[in-house]
Amino acid sequence: MKILVTGGAGFIGSAVIRHIINNTDDTVLNIDKLTYAGNLESLQEISDNPRDHFSKTDICDSESLKRAFNDFEPDVVMHLAAESHVDRSIDGPAAFIETNMIGTYVLLEAARMYWLGLPVERKEAFRLHHISTDEVFGDLHGTEDLFTEQTAYAPSSPYSASKA
């Protein structure tokens, strides 16, 4: 299987890619802009693996995403790219809106256009997983509180609102 991972140089994305490369036969294309949150050193242990590929790409760049989809031909997309620091989102929400909302839309459109060109059997199998954050549910008020699948969104920062 071919898996396109956005934000793969980030904390969670790099753990996902290391797991895929170390525990499956799947091939990965890691798309990451390499901002303050991205660090290719977190992928050093797999950097020589021929199933691990990297592209320094901004998910807001539709042409670069279209090329990545057409060249790599993924079966699955795992979308983890995001601006992710709550305090930074309060000080300057524009980058969070740009990456987390507009970038996600651009990625979805690139995936949709790619999907439209797939044969029926590949269309049926194609998946896009958007990995978000528990912050979209707001704050827990006690140690006994839990979020469930039925918990309503209640974001409390520009970051969590941009991921809802």
Curated annotation (Swiss-Prot):
The active site is at residue 159. Gene3D superfamilies: NAD(P)-binding Rossmann-like Domain. Substrate binds at residue 133. Belongs to the NAD(P)-dependent epimerase/dehydratase family. This is Uncharacterized protein in galE 3'region.
